[in-house]
Amino acid sequence: MPAERRRALDVVAAFLRCPVCAGPVLAGDGQVRCDLGHSFNLARQGYVSLTSGQGGPGTGDSAAMVMARERFLGAGHYRPVADAIAAIAARLARGGEPGLVLDLAGGTGYYLARVLDVLQERHGACVDLSAAALRRAARAHPRAAALGADAWQRLPFADGSAALVLSVFGPRNPAEIRRVLAPGGALIIAVPGPDHQRELRGPLGLIGIDERKTARLADAFGGYPGAGVSAVRYQLRLGHADLTDLVAMGPSARHIAAGDLADRVAALPDPVTVTVDVEVRSYRELPGAARRDVHYEIIYIQT
């Protein structure tokens, strides 16, 4: 492992807790280990699985889904979304202070890397269950560590350890986010907006957007002062290869056979106009603070 990535794991380890006994851990000699002797090996690809058992991550996105995501994101199609998240993170950061950026269900670390590019004093941890994703997340950024853990369950982090928590298109446990978020820390959540991929839902049989998603977020995180809501909206022109990757990297891939997807994509024009509509919500943890009115902005991006 390169020295800078070794240092990233050492820095992040100070915020970690053993998933078995909840004790502090140290990184060294190719493993993460607590005082009671519970140890978790550093995989050859550079990530550490901190599930409660000794085995590595066994669920999460498949290797095919991760490869499709890497190709699609690598082509820059969602770069405006990543840039918007990074800009919001920069606004919420407090005067260049160091701290931990925790990316829950962070996949390949794509969004975490963009945030760390602008928060140059901070280190990051990408948490995911997919071994295929973690292999890539381990190389996503010199100041990021990749950790195998379940975002739905108790996280292997100390109380109040995260200066910033990211949840981008993934599952989240509100109680655990509250536990690990530091006083004065910030939370950024990105979810699909109502028009996201609307041109593809019928022709390709994609999973629909939950109409109650915004209401559920308000219920789950209503105790935080609202720092803002940004709607990132733009259109892409996607050829059939990119279109296939877009579907193959997301949850609809679990419900559409590869052959059926190929047939449906082949029936569409080439290229296809696709709407990107992403709602980015940001919150700050201020114990005892009064609720504030939510500031709303719409970011239109020409592509």
Model-predicted regions and their roles:
Residues 12-14, 231-303:
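Conserved Class I S-adenosyl-L-methionine
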Residues 75-97:
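Conserved alpha-helix/loop element of class I SAM-dependent methyltransferases that forms part
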Residues 186-216:
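Conserved class I S-adenosyl-L-methionine
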Residues 174-186:
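A short glycine-rich, Lys/Arg-flanked "PGG" loop and its adjoining helix->strand segment in the class I
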Residues 153-164:
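A short acidic, Gly/Pro-enriched loop at the edge of an enzyme's catalytic core
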Residues 100-102, 109-154:
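Class I SAM-dependent methyltransferase SAM/SAH-binding core
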Residues 58-83:
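Class I SAM-dependent methyltransferase Rossmann-like catalytic core
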Residues 1-59:
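N-terminal auxiliary segments of SAM/dcSAM-dependent transferases
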